[in-house]
């Protein structure tokens, strides 16, 4: 097994699309999307897949480097001349949002062909079944026709169709793509992998003695094979997957942080795999775009919202001074609950030193349709800031995100890489900020050092008076937020008839809906309770509200606003 390394900064942009073996009809489709050059990872992967058979491929490259098109272009070109329609390409991704995104990429490059691509996991199951398979059965004879060539799916959904959709099969599959491979190879996803591999019926026994073929490029860029006889007798079955065999199915693994755990990779039964990476593996473990500037700010816990406001202010102020559009900002938190509460607070504040901004919550508490709508508005500059849980940390491709903020320090380097990788994509410049609590600084620095990264980390030190301009608006927003949560708490008391069921709210658990929805719900609850309690609830409500606000002022927020 040979690792093929290439430099991320290879400057081959003068090469034409034709020079990479891309056919004219496909070039026209790419040019319609203003794609006239390939990025480095695409320059390596596209021609390699076009001219190579029988090798599985693992690609470890930074987020935003163009990995999706790197495999979509050659795979479409490989199957476009098929005669009988079968499921020949299956792309597995971890989230529904990524399913939609990858499907759109395929749709954009298959124009003018009769290829059909279908996303699984987005539509109702019974509708997907009708779009996948046509039943021509008569009597006791079962005859099924595949209606698609390419499927893009989450792991669970493809397993559902394997088990429950009559006529659906992967035995004709030519290419299995596992995007965000490091996440999908985690233990919780192992069952789907075995089911999918088994369903391809591509298993074959390896002989005890085989020829391992090592591959590298010569000075002319041609592939050279170096044969080396090896014995597998003492290496157990875990090493069998690394050797050459006659194998129909080709597997492609892609991620910004690729695992090298043999026990996990062995489940894939890789065939003579080749590893593509952006730099020498011995020198760097986690590759980041060279166009990304990484910063961190050390802060006290209660100061974090003010640090966030200053980052927003600095980002908006620079663009405003230059007469440019507002920067697109993504702010990551560690939970859905904090995402909701931070979004509520920022909505109430609404501006930083007279610079207005708009923000929305993007988390798993929203439906797929709602998240898609938010992304569309974000792309159209109708939203300045998305407050996100980690649902958006992987794979979501929005080209012009300028700033990524880690409101909470990521617990591991893998998550950090995927978060900050939302900016500085496709050769654009971007900035990331990580707000590090004083108690976490040693862990954070240690984590970044162990990652053996090549980029410089910039520590920003802001004087306390920098935050003074935000103090009044922050306090006002926080007080309004406490009032809203207090009203919600009292409504819950009124609904439940006692004080024993409100402990969860004091811990800051998630409250559904925006600030406006909360207030509307309060009004509806008030009307219902008035009728049910013979118009006595309003007076009781006012008494409880005054009591609650008094307790808040005395104890400095009985409700925990740990944001």
Swiss-Prot record:
Residues 495-510 have a biased composition (Acidic residues). ATP binds at residues 61-68. It is found in: Nucleus, Nucleolus. Coiled coil: none annotated. GO terms for biological process: rRNA processing. It is an enzyme of class 3 (hydrolase). Residues 493-537 are annotated as: Disordered. A motif (Q motif) lies at residues 15-43. A motif (DEAD box) lies at residues 179-182. Gene3D superfamilies: P-loop containing nucleotide triphosphate hydrolases (3.40.50.300). One of its GO terms (cellular component) is nucleus. It holds the Pfam family DEAD. GO terms for molecular function: ATP binding; ATP hydrolysis activity; RNA binding; RNA helicase activity. Disulfide bonds: none annotated. Probable ATP-binding RNA helicase which may be involved in ribosome biogenesis. Belongs to the DEAD box helicase family. DDX51/DBP6 subfamily. PANTHER family: RNA HELICASE. This is Probable ATP-dependent RNA helicase ddx51. It comes from Dictyostelium discoideum (Social amoeba). The gene is ddx51.
